[in-house]
Regions:
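N-terminal periplasmic "start-of-domain" segments of outer-membrane beta-barrel proteins
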Residues: 26-54, 81-84, 102
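N-terminal periplasmic accessory domains that precede
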Residues: 27, 62-64, 82-84, 128, ...
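Extracytoplasmic beta-strand/coil segments of soluble accessory domains associated
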Residues: 62, 66-107
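Short acidic/polar hinge/loop motifs at secondary-structure boundaries
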Residues: 93-94, 101-132
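Transmembrane beta-barrel wall of Gram-negative outer-membrane proteins
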Residues: 158-160, 165-197, 201-244, 268-270, ...
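Surface-exposed extracellular loop regions of Gram-negative outer-membrane beta-barrel proteins
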Residues: 183-202, 216-218, 247, 284-327, ...
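Structural signature of Gram-negative outer-membrane beta-barrels, strongest in the C-terminal barrel
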Residues: 224-230, 238, 334-337, 346-348, ...
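Flexible loop and strand-edge segments within Gram-negative outer membrane beta-barrel domains
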Residues: 232, 236-269, 309, 314-315, ...
């Protein structure tokens, strides 16, 4: 694991070190507009490569998060979907706008707010950017960005497999293989992975030991096609199916549950991504297109018990939320060639535009009954349901210029302008249509002191789109407008030193 810790300078200067040997190969940051050495990075970043992931026997990103300083996650009964960096981020997503403070990208596909799919089999490396990434990602990265890069197809055929058995019915089976096709201009990689475990809890009322199980499937197929010397197409399709029942809450704090209606915390996500790269004489063109479809079931036994455990009272409540989320994104980038001092070209630039849309629907149903044997008017039955629909569109223009004062000193400017439009409506007749224009950016100065260390200063501004407050049954337009809140902004001042000493 290579840790590059950046130092926030307020009144006291704190030193931290990137550690690896001089003989190790160069570490490349892959989550930026263009790949670059970690020594050129101007923000607080931590990179965990595949060898470290394998050595830790880590199956999911939420387990990996224990190795990342300043990163926390929030989970209900199953996998973590929400993350916080430096204390900023969501802990749940029951209602309102599904805005994320921490961006979550896998192979350049945005899964922000859907982190449950982050299984780590056949992953190349994980990058965690701490601090606002307003110029790089936009509204979903107020606090930072998590970028996961899976392994790409290789020029020669290769494969890997994993088989694990353990306590509590644990079974992990994974296989990944690929290489060139008959036409050497095409190469592929196929990944299949299943993870199963009964869980640590036993439902003694139903006499079952798998009501908190993990039953997860990961499928991924990558195809790289080199059409000619200047054109390359990368195709990706993936499916993650997480069938994870939710039965962990206990009345007495033990590992034995008493629920008579165990819930579910499942997620199925289908994704497709197409990346086109075209090289011209003076610049490169990149097109990134992606689409995701997600179905989530989140339910739980709200009384944690059964008719026997609550006797002589009648106490039985259950809640279920069915969520569907569809996303689409199209990004176009124009990138300059690398700097060339021999040609009096000290600039590297990128500019482009990004369009994304999100369509999410939620159906929440709650039912329950309560009865007291001493109450002549009981029992009391309650039933409620609400459907919510939210749509949003984001259009942004972005650019970044790296001006190399010398071969070791770089001044960088980044800017993103973003327009956001949204519509919300629910079955309680609440409706909102907030919109806004937002901007973020970054300016930094980086100086390499030698081949494996640098010093930098940066000012970064991130943003997060606004939203609205629910539950007031507002039908008057004037009242509704008063319930809409503005976007959030975060400005980060950072002074950092990176030193490379030893390898862990």
């Amino acid at each position: 694991m290579y840790i590059r810790k950046k130092i926030l300078f307020i009144f006291i200067l704190l030193f931290s070190f990137t550690v690896f040997t001089q003989d190790i190969e160069e570490i490349i940051v892959k989550g930026e507009y263009r790949e670059k050495s970690i020594i050129e990075e101007d923000s607080s970043i931590l990179i965990i490569q595949s060898d470290k992931i394998k050595s830790q026997a880590i199956k999911h990103f939420q387990q990996l998060s224990y190795l990342v300083p300043n990163l926390n996650y929030a989970a209900s009964d199953s996998r973590a979907r929400y993350f916080q960096i430096r204390g900023i981020g969501e802990r749940s997503g029951y209602q309102g706008t599904p805005n994320s403070s921490v961006g979550f990208l896998i192979d350049d596909i945005d899964y922000s707010g859907q982190g449950g799919i982050a299984t780590l089999f056949d992953v190349d490396q994980v990058e965690v950017f701490r601090g606002p990434q307003g110029s790089r990602t936009g509204a979903n990265a107020l606090a930072g960005l998590i970028y996961i890069k899976t392994k790409d197809p290789t020029d020669k055929f290769e494969g890997t497999s994993e088989l694990t058995f353990g306590d509590y019915g644990t079974q992990n089976i994974g296989v990944a293989f690929g290489g060139p096709l008959n036409n050497e201009k095409m190469k592929y990689r196929l990944v299949m992975r299943t993870d199963y475990a009964d869980g640590f809890r036993k439902n003694i009322y139903l006499n079952k030991s798998d009501t908190s199980k993990k039953d997860e499937l990961t499928l991924r197929y990558k195809l790289d096609w080199e059409i000619d010397e200047t054109t390359n197409i990368n195709f990706l399709v993936s499916k993650v199916d997480m069938d994870d029942p939710a039965d962990i809450w206990t009345i007495d704090g033990s590992l034995n549950t008493l629920s008579d209606r165990p819930g579910m915390d499942s997620q199925i996500t289908d994704s497709i991504g197409i990346k086109i790269k075209k090289n011209f004489n003076n610049f490169d063109l990149q097109s990134l297109t992606s689409s995701t479809k997600t179905d989530v079931v989140f339910s739980y036994d709200a009384d944690w018990g059964n008719s026997d455990s609550h006797f002589p009272y009648t106490y039985d409540y259950f809640s279920e939320t069915l969520r569907k989320r569809d996303t689409f994104s199209q990004e176009i980038r124009f990138l300059s060639k690398n700097k060339d001092f021999s040609q009096s070209n000290p600039l590297e630039w990128v500019f482009g535009f990004d369009f994304s849309e999100l369509d999410e629907s939620n159906l929440t149903k709650d039912d329950g009954v309560y009865g007291d044997p001493s109450d002549p008017f009981g029992p009391y039955v309650s039933e409620s349901s609400i459907s919510r629909n939210y749509k949003s569109e984001n259009l942004s223009l972005f650019g970044n210029i790296d001006y190399f004062l010398t071969n070791k000193t770089k001044l960088a400017f980044g800017l993103r302008l973003e327009n956001w439009d949204s519509k919300y409506k629910d079955s309680n007749n609440e409706s909102f249509s907030p919109s806004d224009n937002m901007s973020g950016g970054k300016i930094s100065l980086v100086k390499k002191t030698n081949n494996d260390s640098n010093i930098y200063f940066s000012i970064a501004r991130g943003y997060k789109q606004g939203g609205f407050n629910l539950g007031l049954d507002a039908t008057d337009n004037l009242v509704r407008q008063s319930l809409i809140y503005d976007p959030e902004y975060l400005t980060n001042y950072e002074f950092g030193i990176s030193l490379s000493l030893i390898h862990i």
